[in-house]
């Protein structure tokens, strides 16, 4: 029987970590180097581990600093999750950088470039007739 509990717990963790980031409860100044948002949380079936996917808007250097800071505050974040969500075991957490938005923007840019090239070719072809 498949349970939906990991997904529900993931949504709770996502909400709480987002709240911590929004309210500035994570005191490390490097976390503020880039604009951070929680995009997804994957929790294992036994609820013992959670991957927190974050999207970071900023320079590559700011993204790197932010990921280093998040790696260092995992203990604090886990402790806060334990206080905020009633679970038998608080999951071990790991922050993972979500690059799907960057990939999506890159694909959109490539499509726009191809479309512009095709329009230029079509215009050049019409001039030739």
Curated annotation (Swiss-Prot):
It comes from the Bacteria. GO terms for biological process: maturation of SSU-rRNA; ribosome biogenesis. It is found in: Cytoplasm. Its main location: cytoplasm. PROSITE patterns: RBFA. GO terms for cellular component: cytosol. Keywords: Cytoplasm, Ribosome biogenesis. GO terms for molecular function: ribosomal small subunit binding. InterPro entries: KH_dom-like_a/b, RbfA, RbfA_dom_sf, Ribosome-bd_factorA_CS. NCBIfam families: rbfA. Belongs to the RbfA family. One of several proteins that assist in the late maturation steps of the functional core of the 30S ribosomal subunit. Associates with free 30S ribosomal subunits (but not with 30S subunits that are part of 70S ribosomes or polysomes). Required for efficient processing of 16S rRNA. May interact with the 5'-terminal helix region of 16S rRNA. Monomer. Binds 30S ribosomal subunits, but not 50S ribosomal subunits or 70S ribosomes. This is Ribosome-binding factor A. It comes from Gloeobacter violaceus (strain ATCC 29082 / PCC 7421). The gene is rbfA.
